[in-house]
Amino acid sequence: MSKTVVRKNESLDDALRRFKRSVSRNGTLQEYRKREFYEKPSVKRKLKSEAARKRKNKRGRRY
């Protein structure tokens, strides 16, 4: 859980910007999106292997 306290003489926009930055740094939003819907274990394995295959192909390319 990210917590941001508005500082003295700080605009709300600046505080919101700091909050968004802290949320993106600690991965709260990504974790929420990942857990938003249930994924069967078989689907998780399939996505994981596809991602590994994609990374492997990406590393193998040479320009």
Curated annotation (Swiss-Prot):
Region Disordered, residue ranges: 40-63
Gene3D superfamilies named in the record: Ribosomal protein S8 (1.20.5.1150)
InterPro entries membership: Ribosomal_bS21, Ribosomal_bS21_CS, Ribosomal_bS21_sf
GO biological process terms held by the UniProt record: translation
Keyword Ribonucleoprotein set for record: yes
Nucleotidyltransferase is among the record's keywords: no
MF GO annotations: structural constituent of ribosome
GO cellular component entries: ribonucleoprotein complex; ribosome
Compositionally skewed regions (Basic and acidic residues) per UniProt: 40-52
Domain of life, per lineage: Bacteria
Keywords linked to the UniProt accession: Ribonucleoprotein, Ribosomal protein
Pfam families, per database record: Ribosomal_S21
Biased composition (Basic residues): 53-63
Family statement: Belongs to the bacterial ribosomal protein bS21 family.
Protein name in the entry: Small ribosomal subunit protein bS21
Gene name as annotated: rpsU
